Amino acid sequence: MGDYLVKALAYDGQVRACAARTTETVGEAPRRHQTWPTASAALGRALTAGSMMGAMLKGDETLTIKIDGGGPIGTILVDSNAKGEVRGYVTNPHVHFELNEHGKLDVARAVGKNGMLTFVKDLGLRDFFTGQVPIISGELGEDFTYYFASSEQVPSSVGVGVLVNPDHTILAAGGFILQLMPGTEEKTIDQIERRLQTIPPVSRMVESGLTPEEILEELLGKGNVKVLETLPVAFVCRCSRERIADALISLGAQEIQDIIDKEGYAEASCHFCNETYHFTKEELKQLKQLADAKKA
């Protein structure tokens, strides 16, 4: 079963819901960035939340999430879009601690609680939509929940989880977002709250083989969920050799000549996917000609 998410309504439209399986997507974190387990869990939770929040967008709209809690992990940055594509990185990938008192990876200690959670949505308008809230727990699920309630005024529950194997690969990852629509009945809220208190962690549900549809049934009850859309989820980076070449051209002919004289080659790495692009002296000379032509 590949990674995917489902968008759904429940309780006759009173609840908007999304659930995702992101095991392979999150698995790109240790593969691309050599993240240690606690860092993998933190970045994986952010990637999972980003994929689900991106799925709430439309068309070519995009979302950037910046998590900076002042902890040893540094900054987590995640980009996502409406197509189920997500990418991300963490400033300090080599962070790992002993399990916390609950027997889980200590994401809160890695992320920290002295900072902000920032969301930037590019909706294709003149200005970006920006929302920012203080980080209240560092576990991220609670922090995303607080963002929805505080910045978007939507009562929500967000759960994200990652299980890491002893060899640092990803065993299971996934998440859910539940949102109450205006006018939701009290009995519906009570039922959901009771279920949230009794269900296993979402990462354990994914590990046991539950699909996103089945996770929503665990959360909301069988027969209450109406799936609206299914969307593949994947780690996809928008970087390319052409984009890096354009960036070099934008430096100008003189700057490119300086690189040729001093280094004889150019090398650039993408923060998001860790892909490295190499340009030989001959290729740089061609880019210099293009920069000259552009200036003319």
UniProtKB/Swiss-Prot annotation:
The lineage of its organism: Bacteria, Bacillati, Bacillota, Bacilli, Bacillales. CDD domains: Hsp33. The keyword ATP-binding does not apply. Gene3D superfamilies: Hsp33 domain, HSP33 redox switch-like. Keywords: Chaperone, Cytoplasm, Disulfide bond, Redox-active center, Zinc. GO terms for biological process: protein refolding. This is 33 kDa chaperonin. PANTHER family: 33 KDA CHAPERONIN. Disulfide bonds join C237-C239, C270-C273. Belongs to the HSP33 family. GO terms for cellular component: cytoplasm. The keyword tRNA processing does not apply. Redox regulated molecular chaperone. Protects both thermally unfolding and oxidatively damaged proteins from irreversible aggregation. Plays an important role in the bacterial defense system toward oxidative stress. It comes from the Bacteria.
